[in-house]
Curated annotation (Swiss-Prot):
Identification of the protein by name: UPF0235 protein SG2030
NCBIfam families: DUF167 family protein, PRK05090.1
Species the sequence originates in: Sodalis glossinidius (strain morsitans)
Gene Ontology cellular-component annotations: cytoplasm
HAMAP family, sorted: UPF0235 (MF_00634)
Taxonomy of the source species: Bacteria, Pseudomonadati, Pseudomonadota, Gammaproteobacteria, Enterobacterales
Family matches, as Pfam families: DUF167
Length: 101
């Protein structure tokens, strides 16, 4: 069986992630692979940018960086997003496995 190629890569000190977001989840967590993206479940509703703000706060905490270092590049209004994380201090276990670190 061929494993899917997940879109997570490094550009120097920047980590780039392609995500599939599940809003209104029971808890915040990085669920793992979802096709060629990483599924992230968050508790915030997809209303008035609440989910995006919550996602940035959650990922900043998970990667040990300031919120200003998490940049939403694509997908502001949809579930499919691309984010850049500048100089992550730590990698969540799910992401580390995908990068084979």
């Amino acid at each position: 069986m061929v494993s899917p190629v997940i879109d997570v890569w490094r550009e120097g000190d920047v980590l780039v992630l392609r995500l599939y977001i599940q809003p209104r989840a029971s808890r915040d967590h990085i669920a793992g692979a979802h096709g060629d993206e990483i599924k992230v479940a968050i508790t915030a509703p997809p209303v008035d940018g609440q989910a995006n703000s919550h996602l940035i706060r959650f990922l900043a905490k998970e990667f040990g960086v300031a919120k200003s270092r998490v940049i939403l590049e694509k997908g502001e209004l949809g579930r499919h997003k691309q984010l850049r994380i500048d100089q992550p201090r730590q990698l969540p276990e799910v992401i580390a496995r995908l990068l084979d670190v």
